[in-house]
Curated annotation (Swiss-Prot):
Protein name, entry field: Actin
Catalyzed reactions: ATP + H2O = ADP + phosphate + H(+)
PROSITE patterns: ACTINS_1 (PS00406), ACTINS_2 (PS00432), ACTINS_ACT_LIKE (PS01132)
Source organism: Chlamydomonas reinhardtii (Chlamydomonas smithii)
PANTHER family: ACTIN (PTHR11937)
Subcellular location: Cytoplasm, Cytoskeleton
Gene3D superfamilies linked to this entry: 3.30.420.40, Actin, Chain A, domain 4
Function field: Actins are highly conserved proteins that are involved in various types of cell motility and are ubiquitously expressed in all eukaryotic cells.
Amino acid sequence: MADEGEVSALVCDNGSGMVKAGFAGDDAPRAVFPSIVGRPRHTGVMVGMGQKDSYVGDEAQSKRGILTLRYPIEHGIVTNWDDMEKIWHHTFFNELRVAPEEHPVLLTEAPLNPKANREKMTQIMFETFNVPAMYVAIQAVLSLYASGRTTGIVLDSGDGVTHTVPIYEGYALPHAILRLDLAGRDLTDYLMKILMERGYSFTTTAEREIVRDIKEKLCYVALDFEQEMATALSSSALEKTYELPDGQMITIGNERFRCPEVLFNPNMIGMEAVGIHDTTFNSIMKCDVDIRKDLYNNIVLSGGTTMFPGIADRMSKEITALAPSAMKIKVVAPPERKYSVWIGGSILASLSTFQQMWIAKSEYDESGPSIVHRKCF
């Protein structure tokens, strides 16, 4: 691979909510679009309209009023491979406009994913898209690359899955990786539910997208939940309005911080799990006592669900309460954290030392899909 330097690798971060794709060496992804495949709910009556039987990404999003939207990736695991293939096809041919058989491809996945998921990804890349080489990297590890560190604990929370990955001197510590199947999509669902209590009904897959937008624009994390609830009760200072696509205005008050509070208290949605602060703490406690100090000092946030205002301060406060009293706690929230997994992938795929790590097509042909477990972390 290394001798033909002009062929740049493709980096594709397939999130549960958004696909981020582009070329290795770039500082930002060229294509960012929702991981959605939409199918018409109604039959076409006008001949010659060029109706398609499925739409992907932004096109599905813009026609969502007449479509049923499906996300093929749930909780970081691909649940519908036909739709996933459509998304990759759209990524390569429509968004990046490249021939995948000419470029090595770096894909990402959540840690503690089923092995079969990774094998199937490998198989589709080599057999359907005929890529010359590929690699599957762990998302959180890439985020740490992007932040310029080699040691730290990454709390990566996207649309489908949240995980904490402690990394020391470049090595991920697999025994201490924890995963929480609670992320942005669950928050959107919870916001849909609590908005219903206010009398606003959102039910279809298209309306869920509106609620996701409300969440992204208006929600924030309270530093002190009880106190914030009291403030919201006594005054309307925290109320904000949002204009729906049809021009109707809705008012949202304590829902603004009740929604992301679920991250710190999953019991609110009936999940028997501990919050992201406890998960991070537990992950650190599973590591060797000698390296904990370095981890406490480098808690790196990554992923779209860490974009809520106030999340870093709250995280810092909660971890400080759990950690030994004299411990120095530092929570790092890089401004580009929405894309830091992709940026890390771009850095990794363009390193000269990485070029011998690719799984080549010849190796795949010899060993089959299981090669991915031997060559990728």
